[in-house]
């Protein structure tokens, strides 16, 4: 695995590259409060292609950001990383925040993407009591371990946390390393600020496949082939075999487009 850091408008972005052949690579983007280890069970042997794993801004080995930002900035970050790596076309697999970024990037730059995997993707604007709950939760980020423990309970199913309590512990460890202001900015940019993306799904011209968990809080995205799998919002941890099949399906869509 080759690792490097790429300068972007959202700080230094850590990238790990699992090289495997000369076909169009697969790029992986994780969700909030996770890192590229989300994809540990999905090496390049799965697709026979090079896999590029990105630590999202202010997550994993990527640096803090230091200023307010938006999902549009994430799109620019992704395109910047691809440009720096010399990747003109790719397949992108996104989880949650990563899929929100992938959708917007594929809509804005459709020629750069052969297919997109939209896994556990929130696409409706956070509103009502849910929005109020996230606003109140922001007050807890000054206690990152406590906040992360509560976040894990809402993101993972109860069953998987009983089987793998380490998932909650690792989330607590990750958030405890970040300034509370950075965590607060993530909540704003990814959860509170995004507008409804339904129209983007209707106008998407890139082949796409979606996956959601049975107890996931996100709905079924319109006009997109969707698989419902066991578990909650973090399907790559909770439904490994189903996620592997979903990744292969996205690659199939890309191959069909190229044929």
Regions found by a protein language model. Name each.
Residues 224-259:
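Catalytic active-site module of serine/aspartate enzymes centered on a nucleophile-bearing elbow/loop
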Residues 103, 107-108, 113-144:
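Flexible "cap/lid" loop of the alpha/beta hydrolase fold
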Residues 204, 210-212:
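Short beta-strand/loop motif that positions the catalytic acidic residue
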Residues 212-213, 217-222:
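Conserved alpha/beta-hydrolase "acid-adjacent" motif
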Residues 40, 52-93:
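Active-site loop/oxyanion-hole signature of alpha/beta-hydrolase fold enzymes
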Residues 94-98, 102:
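Gly/Ala-rich beta-loop-alpha elbow adjacent to hydrolase catalytic centers
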Residues 11-63:
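Conserved HGGG/HGGXW glycine-rich cap/lid loop of the alpha/beta-hydrolase fold
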Residues 127-131, 145-200:
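Conserved alpha/beta-hydrolase catalytic His-Asp/Glu region
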């Amino acid at each position: 695995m080759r690792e490097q850091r790429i300068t972007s408008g959202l700080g230094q972005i850590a990238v790990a590259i699992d090289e495997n052949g000369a076909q169009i690579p697969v790029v992986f983007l994780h969700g909030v409060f996770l890192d590229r280890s989300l994809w540990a069970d999905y090496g390049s042997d799965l697709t026979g292609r090079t896999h590029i794993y990105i630590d999202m801004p202010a997550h994993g080995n990527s640096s803090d950001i230091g200023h307010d930002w938006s999902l549009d900035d994430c799109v620019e970050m992704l395109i910047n990383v691809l440009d720096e790596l010399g990747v003109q076309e790719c397949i992108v697999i996104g989880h949650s925040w990563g899929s929100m970024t992938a959708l917007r990037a594929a809509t804005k730059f459709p020629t750069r993407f052969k297919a997109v995997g939209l896994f556990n993707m929130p696409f409706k604007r956070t509103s009502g009591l849910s929005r109020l709950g996230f606003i109140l939760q922001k007050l807890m980020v000054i206690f990152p371990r406590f906040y992360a423990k509560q976040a894990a309970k809402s993101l993972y199913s109860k069953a998987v946390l009983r089987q793998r309590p380490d998932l909650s512990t690792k989330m607590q460890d990750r958030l405890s390393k970040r300034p509370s202001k950075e965590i607060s900015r993530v909540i704003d940019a990814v959860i509170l600020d995004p507008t409804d993306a339904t129209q983007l799904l209707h106008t998407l011209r890139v082949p796409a496949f979606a996956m959601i968990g049975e107890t996931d809080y996100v709905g079924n995205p319109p006009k997109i082939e969707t698989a419902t799998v066991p578990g909650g919002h973090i399907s790559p941890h909770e439904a490994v075999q189903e996620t592997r099949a979903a990744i292969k399906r996205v690659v199939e869509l890309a191959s069909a487009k190229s044929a």
